[in-house]
Amino acid sequence: MLVITTTDDSGDSRTRRLARLDSDGRIYVSAHHWPRAWYRRAIDNPEVRVEIDGVESDFVAVPVTGEEFGRVAAEFPLPLPVRFLMGFPPPREILRLDPAT
């Protein structure tokens, strides 16, 4: 798990606890359920703050597409029972969290 802090255009910050997906030495998060405001804020303002194991760091949220999306989605599938419990959510979106430089 991790805690991501995203900021909207007015400068208001919000935090959200998300599942941490570790793949190929990188950190990913997935928007696969109805509460997606955090995802929209990260797309609009990709500089995010992330807490992992009690340590906060700055990251840049990068939308994942193509082959990389397919690989990560296949590595962390959403089983049918989970999708059913979520009410068959909208299509999944994945962000890669790159360390800010």
Predicted feature residues:
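Short, structured beta-strand-loop surface elements
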Residues: 24, 33-101
